[in-house]
Amino acid sequence: MILRFRSKKGTLRAEAQPTDLFDVAFKKLTEDLPDIDPATITLATSPTGKQEPASRLLGKTVQKLGLNHGDMLFVSYTDSAPRAAVEAVTAETAPQMTAAHIRDATKQLPVDDYLEKQDGKIKRQLSALQQRKFGSRGMGEDTLPVDPWDEEYLKEQKIKHMSYHAYVKKLNSQANKKNGGGYIAPLNVSDFGVSKSCTGAHAPWPEGICSRCQPSAITLQSQPFRMVDHVEFAESGMINSFIEPWRQSGTQRIGWMYGHYEPYELVPLGIKAVVEAIYEPAQSGEYDGITITEITQADGQPQPPHIATAEACGLVPLGVIFTDLVDAGNGDGSVICKRHADSYFLSSLEVAFAGAMQARFPNKSRWSPTSEFSSKFVTAVISGNPKGEIDVSCYQVSEQCEAMARADLIEPSINPSVLLVKEATKTRYVPDVFYKKNNEYGRTVLQGANPQLPVDYMLVTLTHGFPQDPRPLFSSGLSSFPVENRELIGVTQSPQALGKALDSGSAGGAVSNFHLLSYIQSMGVLSAEEFQLLAKVATEKKDEDVSRLVASEGWNNLLLIIQ
């Protein structure tokens, strides 16, 4: 049936069934009258009849309201400001209030809270000549402290990427002057998907789209900052233990890195990821790749043992580490160098995987309009270096790469140095993608990336190393208890192995092993409180906690099981 609406802009029509709610016809009316305030609409059955607020008719069927095919309703309303003007006002006011609220409400990592309070200014050392010239307290222009994002200083120190907090302070100095007006979130979160909150007069995507809700063309740029500057492995034995399955079987290995973040003094306002444990999920290793077979956690199901163990020990997921090793066949332990400047550093498959993982582990930030910005999740590769030695390399992918992964725009190719931009479908909108390159005349030009895209534009390199004075969180030694999921090389976790490990030393020292803790957690013998106490014993090693653990019911039940 057709209902007619007479307004000062003419007669409008809306189609509805007798059993439909009046809301169906009202929605069509408001779409045909976009520049009005819907809250002011009133309806009458005659030009001089009593006007009824339209809101009172909503929620009732057309039939119940006594409306028939061809009936005409007379519409009155108040004109509102043009939509563009309303959106302009909203854009100027609402985001400022929202950004300030998000800034104050967002809970960041402790390392971020600490670093954002530091000014990061770099003090220059005075030469003997400058000390004679200016005195101990005097300063010339070339001896004043410099900002942590100073390009000349970073170049002098051979720092390729400024730190995340230096980047935030640089943007903040431009966006929010000390005596300026309202607060503006300095970080810009890339979003290459179709807007789902478009106010245009069309059906939501994928049924409809307009120039306001479709994403703009993407111009890829090398990222000038990095979210993490350095990866520190708590002890070198951790890497040796991780590559042992490759040494015995020749197959590759993957693991999840757990640890915490600390300030990194060698980069202004830098952050380092300190790896305390590597958990090896269930996997099927091949000579040239890996398939993770660990069952994904279902909604409402208990957390996997390694995640629950990490949380109990105060650790967070830091990243992923995997091997790509091929023996050189020289009989001296040397390996083939596959990754270098003339081939690739991370393959397109690995870049796509890293982008998806970083999008899965977003970084909380008070300086983002969404409370999240990029990720601190890192990717570490153990492979051969140009000297034929086994070495570690650490990377992240850019924030733009994360956004492209979220929007389902990229996929790997058979060429390891080239990503592919996916084709558009009915449900996937693909904007134009460009990147800058030097042409045959040495000029910088924009190159279309549809469909191929060099992976170099996505990579951010990190440094790595080991502490000079190792003080690992877990002290029982990596050989004290079998590592999980190593059945391929004849290594199995069992109650007998647990009993042997616990008999090897004091309770406090014997349980200080991440793999042992994860195994105990998987047994389900200890209560949540008892396991939390066990984790505290393993990480803090206090005598009073050991006494409480030994006296607990769950611990004694565990000892009975493994006897």
From Swiss-Prot:
The keyword Nucleus applies. GO terms for biological process: cytoplasm protein quality control by the ubiquitin-proteasome system; DNA replication termination; endosome to plasma membrane protein transport; mitochondria-associated ubiquitin-dependent protein catabolic process; mitotic spindle disassembly; mRNA transport; nonfunctional rRNA decay; positive regulation of protein localization to nucleus. It is found in: Cytoplasm, Perinuclear region; Endoplasmic reticulum membrane; Nucleus membrane. GO terms for molecular function: K48-linked polyubiquitin modification-dependent protein binding; ubiquitin binding; ubiquitin protein ligase binding. Keywords: Cytoplasm, Endoplasmic reticulum, Membrane, mRNA transport, Nucleus, Protein transport, Translocation, Transport. InterPro entries: MPN, Npl4, NPL4_C, NPL4_Zn-bd_put. It comes from the Eukaryota. Its main location: cytoplasm. Residues 231-373 form the MPN domain. One of its GO terms (cellular component) is perinuclear region of cytoplasm. It is a peripheral membrane protein. Pfam families: NPL4 (PF05021), zf-NPL4 (PF05020). The keyword Glycoprotein does not apply. Involved in the import of nuclear-targeted proteins into the nucleus and the export of poly(A) RNA out of the nucleus. Has a role in the endoplasmic reticulum-associated degradation (ERAD) pathway. Belongs to the NPL4 family. This is Nuclear protein localization protein 4. It comes from Yarrowia lipolytica (strain CLIB 122 / E 150) (Yeast). The gene is NPL4.
